[in-house]
């Protein structure tokens, strides 16, 4: 178990808020929940996400101290994407139109950190990933281009025949 890690969430109340500066500056191991977590939820009704005059159109996710608290505040929130179509924000990213869902905080920062880590590092540890998300696969594809034969990808998964042959064969 990874005890000493950074995920960018800070605070001591019943929920923590995301601070991208904390994530960026930390020297600890970084845990990026690219598809969310069961202890994420939205702020209690009536609490604002920002100090801006205009309210946020896409609510930030906060991290609750327990799953039970998070589940009380995890109902999907609806807004519109740039094209004007309905977009659902949720504590777990599933289904189609994932790129629309990635603009919620912390996902937008987690994905940015993921891309920057790929650029800087030839090593990648993947745990329990289905390889069915184009936005992540595109970044993983770049590891070989960026790092050539120096790249190391370790995949830990309980399903042995997922779509990893592309990444394994690239080293031959």
Name these PLM-found stretches.
Residues 1-90, 102:
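Extended, H/D-rich, highly charged conserved domains that either
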Residues 90-96:
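Gly-rich Lys/Arg/Thr-decorated short loops/hinges at beta-loop-alpha junctions or inter-strand turns
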Residues 21, 27, 97-172:
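SIR2/sirtuin-family catalytic core signature
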């Amino acid at each position: 178990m990874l005890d000493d890690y950074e995920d960018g969430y800070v605070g001591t109340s019943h929920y923590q808020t995301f601070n991208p500066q904390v994530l960026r500056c930390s020297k600890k191991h970084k845990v990026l929940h690219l598809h969310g977590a069961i202890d994420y939820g939205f702020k209690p009704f009536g609490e604002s996400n920002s100090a801006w005059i205009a309210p946020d159109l896409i609510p930030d996710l906060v991290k609750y101290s327990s799953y039970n608290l998070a589940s009380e505040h995890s109902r999907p929130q609806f807004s519109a994407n740039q094209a004007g179509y309905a977009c659902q924000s949720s504590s777990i990213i599933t289904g189609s139109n994932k790129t629309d869902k990635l603009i919620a905080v912390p996902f937008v920062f987690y994905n940015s950190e993921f891309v920057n880590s790929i650029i800087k590092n030839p090593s990648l540890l993947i745990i329990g990933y289905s390889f069915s998300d184009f936005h992540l696969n595109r970044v993983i594809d770049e590891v070989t281009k960026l790092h050539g034969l120096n790249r190391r990808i370790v995949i830990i998964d309980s399903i042995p025949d997922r779509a990893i042959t592309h990444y394994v064969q690239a080293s031959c």
